């Protein structure tokens, strides 16, 4: 990890007019939404800043994501993943993080489409950077970066932690393989690392049948849930209804291509 940005002084923690969250996820692509789903389900107040430009939307048809035997429209896949994160408890802010600073006493303040000192600022204890391929907002944090030609990657410890305490990174931004399923898995891994570091009680994110733990004389571990048969059937019915609604007709959003091929005029 060769290129370390210069560190700027922390900003004031006078955030009375700023939104406060446990976790800020920068980027609403596959890795970011996967991370947000896990942190929100673990009970951490999570907000995702998303400019709507996930690179996965350039795919004509996603054909290697588990669970879709005939593939899935990439724009629909993004919509479904966003809805899953929302149902899990994540909030969303449309826009782009343009500035990120450490805060006196811990945590971070982020500027959305503006400086951190504007009313658009967000405060979070933890940040997950999942904004492939933008790292410009990290310039003042002194995080370890690796420049490879036109690409810049964030160094991590293998589990999503960066060289800056409280800052995590997920997906292609950490030089993981450029595949949707890899990004989803790494987003989940990074989120679980963050949850453990936050000291939030957590064992696994499991929904189990009634008695799975308690009938063996065990308490239900943190992060897990036992549900009875009636609740299982209710959730299954809801999932069928939700999926049928998503797949009722073709997705209306037009196919995207590489930005260099788009005529801006």
Annotated model-derived regions:
Residues 24-26, 120-134:
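Short hydrophobic core segments
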Residues 101-121:
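Conserved beta-strand-loop-beta-strand element in the redox core of flavoprotein oxidoreductases
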Residues 5-11, 20, 41, 134-177:
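FAD-site-proximal beta/loop scaffold in flavoenzymes
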Residues 21-76:
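Beta1-alpha1 glycine-rich phosphate/pyrophosphate-binding loop at the start
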């Amino acid at each position: 990890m060769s290129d370390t940005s210069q560190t700027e002084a922390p900003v004031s923690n006078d955030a009375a007019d700023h939104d406060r969250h446990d976790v800020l996820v920068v980027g609403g692509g596959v890795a970011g939404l996967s991370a947000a789903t896990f942190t929100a389900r673990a009970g951490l107040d999570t907000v995702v800043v998303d400019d709507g430009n996930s690179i996965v939307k350039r795919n004509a048809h996603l054909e290697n994501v588990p669970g879709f035997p005939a593939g899935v429209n990439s724009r629909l896949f993004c919509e479904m993943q966003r809805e899953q994160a929302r149902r899990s408890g994540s909030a969303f802010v449309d826009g782009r993080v343009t500035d990120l600073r450490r805060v006196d006493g811990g945590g971070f303040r982020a500027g959305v489409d503006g400086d951190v000192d504007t009313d658009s600022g967000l405060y979070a204890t933890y940040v997950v950077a999942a904004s492939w391929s933008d790292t410009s907002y990290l310039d003042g944090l002194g995080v370890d970066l690796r420049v490879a030609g036109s690409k810049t990657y964030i160094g991590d410890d293998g589990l999503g932690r960066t060289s800056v305490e409280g800052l995590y990174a997920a997906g292609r931004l950490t030089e993981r393989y450029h595949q949707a399923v890899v990004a989803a898995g790494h987003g989940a891994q990074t989120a679980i690392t963050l949850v453990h570091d936050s000291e939030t009680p957590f064992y696994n994110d499991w929904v189990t049948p009634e008695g799975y733990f308690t009938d063996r004389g065990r308490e239900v571990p943190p992060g897990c849930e036992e549900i009875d048969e009636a609740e299982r059937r209710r959730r299954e019915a809801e999932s069928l209804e939700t999926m049928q609604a998503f797949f009722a007709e073709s997705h209306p959003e037009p196919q995207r291509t590489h930005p260099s091929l788009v005529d801006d005029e």
